[in-house]
Design a protein with these regions (language model features):
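Inter-motif core of Ras-like GTPase G domains
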Residues: 86-114
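Short glycine-/polar-rich loops that comprise or flank the Walker A/P-loop
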Residues: 101-106, 130-133, 163
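Beta-strand-loop-alpha "switch" segments that mediate conformational coupling across diverse proteins
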Residues: 142-207
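Conserved C-terminal guanine-recognition region of P-loop GTPase G domains, centered on the G4
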Residues: 94-95, 99, 115-131
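Walker A/P-loop NTP-binding active-site region of P-loop NTPases
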Residues: 2-57
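Switch II (G3) loop of P-loop NTPases
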Residues: 71-90
Length: 244
């Protein structure tokens, strides 16, 4: 079995890249081969990525080959590109092609108490529900236009789908301030820890471990079935054992 994970919400600053960085670390500690995919040249991540351009389109076999040669492929669909990626995906019947190579699809939707974010997540769920497992992740973010997630039309729709719902903890304000002081944000800090002080690295690791413990609840939807283990791997930076 293989797994394609798509992180999608066409609203800006809703936690997509933070989830990408977290999931990448989660999968890596499982000892699985993975590929990170971006859908726009404007996305800049300080790690190796593959570009599948959502706006201009990409050869369908590119995605199939990536999945076929790698246990897990994580797609960070850029803001404004999720719908383009979806149209290209279904127009080329990639759901059928992935099914032929025994690849499961999981779509992860970041949400917060914001009108636009919730609306976009609901729209993405409507599209992907027919071929993918849906995981909704509540992010600790401020809203531009507040709408309580609990009891919202989006939350009711996710419940009807039977989507898994997770809530990630917030990063401490003092740690966010330290990260911003070196011109980073949370996802970049997760991927470029060498720029952080030891104290901030330690606090960020503690937050990451807590977040990954929550992600473990969705492990059946994230990790390919034949690769699920409870192995313990060493953290390369701190030399600490993280049992996932």
């Amino acid at each position: 079995m293989k797994k394609l994970i798509i992180i999608a919400n066409d609203t800006d600053a809703c936690g997509k890249t933070t989830l990408t960085a977290l999931l990448s670390g989660f999968v890596q500690r499982k000892g699985l081969r993975q590929t990170l995919v971006v859908t726009s040249q404007e996305q800049e991540l300080p790690v190796d990525t593959v570009l599948l351009d959502a706006e201009d389109g990409f050869a369908p076999e590119e995605l199939v080959d990536l999945v076929d040669h790698c246990g897990v492929v994580i797609v960070d669909a850029h803001t404004g590109g999720a719908e383009d990626f979806e149209k290209h995906f279904f127009r080329n019947r990639l759901d059928e092609a992935l099914d032929e190579i025994e690849c499961g699809v999981t779509v992860i939707l970041p949400v917060c108490d914001d009108v636009a974010v919730l609306h976009q997540a609901q729209e993405r769920a409507r599209v992907w529900n027919k071929c993918a497992e849906v995981v909704v992740v509540r992010m600790p973010l401020l809203a531009d236009e507040h709408q309580e997630y609990k009891g919202s039309p989006a939350q009711r729709y996710f419940s009807q789908l039977g989507a898994m719902e997770l809530t990630l903890p917030a990063v401490k304000d003092c740690i966010l301030d330290e990260i911003e002081a070196v011109d980073l944000d949370v996802p970049l800090a997760l991927l470029q820890r060498q720029h952080l002080t030891r104290f901030v690295r330690t606090e960020l690791l503690a937050w990451e471990v807590s977040a990954c413990e929550i992600l473990r609840n969705a492990e059946d939807l994230i990790i390919p079935a034949n690769s699920r283990t409870s192995d313990t791997r060493d953290d390369a930076i701190f030399g600490k054992s993280l049992a996932f």
